[in-house]
Amino acid sequence: MPSPTASKCFWIRLQQLRFHAHHGLLPEEATLGQRFVLDLECAYHPPSEPWTDELSHTVSYAELCEQIRELCEQRRFKLLESLADAIVERLRAEFPKLEYIRVCLHKPSVPLAALLDEAAVELRWCSETWPNSLASS
């Protein structure tokens, strides 16, 4: 387990990942679907062995995208909070070297009487070894 005081930390950010899915409370949302936008930020400490230019030392952002896309297209959620939680749990299971995950899930087309640009939910998870000072930034 890496030391929380390690001097190096890699951050991976995927911004504005767009997908069409059928999440939401309303029957129309289940039938028609809509666009969702996701921002992902995750971090890990590098391995203690000497760094090489190999994918095994990092987390593939292509695989991160694929895991998120697969989950969003194969399951239906009524709540953005439930979808955000499922994404975090999937990424924790598939990428055990991740020590910090932040998911911000945007729903641009909100079926409300009020005028707004979007609704969004953010969920942050950090391992017990993750420094608290970094988790709140």
What would you call each of these model-derived segments?
Residues M1-S137:
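N-terminal, polar/charged subdomain of small-to-medium soluble alpha/beta proteins
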